[in-house]
């Protein structure tokens, strides 16, 4: 099974991906996480350091694939999750999609691409050009990370459009949304009401999720010394269980941009109007 994780930049894709990878491993699966971001920090909380990238390794070998060994590019992370960082071209040059293609090509050359139960692609930001949509060419499922905000849901809608486009020629389905670190889910619910898709999980606003990234540890590793965090791990285990059940998934039908803008902005405006009316009523009551 191959999974591509997308979402707005800074939404917490890598943190979520690492914890999902651990959860899948806890369910007895052999897991490989591939970071598809020039920052090459996707697997940081699994390995505790920035591992060398595929592109760096290939460059050091003058792109002689026969000189590259699995241990040159595949690193063992926490929980027996294997880790690879694709890397990227120099800033302002080249195509990230090409890098993803080279990564998959090399893993196939090493007979490593098909030996895992689950391969998870963690893809940078909300860039949905043909290049960074490349992991969708290999994926069975796409998971979109979002929060309860306007920008994240707007990005999710654009990613849903990419899934629909790729599903024309590939056996790809959207597994669903994962809400990350959000105190509310009303806007998420409003969106999925207008654009039907599964919501796999909504994680509450837990500060330790953010702290884990800074510490370079997954929530599962932190929970080993702090049992109060075990309930957070259950969220990721729930996501893993849903994925392993091989859900039917959907081919989403995204909302046109202007229609979505109106839907989400009207929702915000109505909330503000209701809040103002409530404040006025309370003020009137106090005056009386």
From Swiss-Prot:
* CDD domains referenced in this protein's UniProt entry, alphabetically: Bchl-like (cd02032)
Please tell me where [4Fe-4S] cluster binds in this chain. Answer: 95, 129
Positions binding ATP in this chain are 10-15, 39, 180-181
The reaction(s) this protein catalyses: chlorophyllide a + oxidized 2[4Fe-4S]-[ferredoxin] + 2 ADP + 2 phosphate = protochlorophyllide a + reduced 2[4Fe-4S]-[ferredoxin] + 2 ATP + 2 H2O
Q: Where along this sequence does the record place binding of Mg(2+)?
A: 14
User: Is Transport tagged as a keyword?
Assistant: no
Relay the cofactor remark from the entry.
Binds 1 [4Fe-4S] cluster per dimer.
Q: What metabolic or biological pathway is this protein involved in?
A: Porphyrin-containing compound metabolism; chlorophyll biosynthesis (light-independent)
Q: Which family does it belong to?
A: Belongs to the NifH/BchL/ChlL family.
Role summary? Component of the dark-operative protochlorophyllide reductase (DPOR) that uses Mg-ATP and reduced ferredoxin to reduce ring D of protochlorophyllide (Pchlide) to form chlorophyllide a (Chlide). This reaction is light-independent. The L component serves as a unique electron donor to the NB-component of the complex, and binds Mg-ATP.
This one is known as: Light-independent protochlorophyllide reductase iron-sulfur ATP-binding protein
